[in-house]
Amino acid sequence: MNFFEDLTLVYNKAIKKTLKNIKNNPVILLGPIFYGALYQIAINIFSIFIAPLLGVLSGFLLPIVSSMILSSYFSMLSDVIYYNRISFNNFTRSFTDYFSSIYSVYFILIIISWITPMLGNLPVAHLFISVILVVLFNPIAEEIYIGGNTYTQAYSKCVEFFKENAFLWMLPFILYLLITQVMGFSIANGLMFSNVIDIPLGNFQMSPLMGTSNIKAIIALLLTGVYAIFRGNLFTILNNSTRRKRAYMGEYYDDWRKTRKRN
């Protein structure tokens, strides 16, 4: 099986699973809207009332809030990807399901954010490093809620995943960025390393006032919901797999199907 056959096989399987997930759980598309609004409200409250009192310590405490919100969203995505259903019975507990894993990854992001200013006032260098890190660690959210990895292991597993699946993984991400760029959103937001763990959530803020900007943001967030589910399904297909292994399994399945037809 050549590269393009593998690409077609993988994407077709991921798309079919994604459509099935959405058909059975359409509410999942509202995830980025609900959690994005919750995220925005929490950050505004923190920035206005708490950050001025804590100063530099707020850099460690704000990720606590972010980690809890992402934990709940990742828990919902996990239910859909693994079981093709959403359960709200343990909704309150979902805010802690992946909390420690997410915060451990955020901690490293904080350390990196302290190191990068040492490069001085070099915007091009900062952007270049940010893009490289976003590419290498792009699937870190999936490494957490699907791969079950945490702290430095989550980052190292991302690099391993990238070595084997760089093109298959990054092509949908680039397409997603281009679509949002056409919609009027800056592609730079998706290339900021500080937002790498938030990719399945999107980074499109809504205004309290209704307007065309809010309509575009809602459409972008719905698109993000579709993309987040697709990412999860794509990750489950590619993780711990190789093109050779997929070729063997695909050929085995084709032979089995032909045998069944003859019988």
Regions found by a protein language model. Give the residues of each.
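Hydrophobic alpha-helical membrane segments
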Residues: 1-263
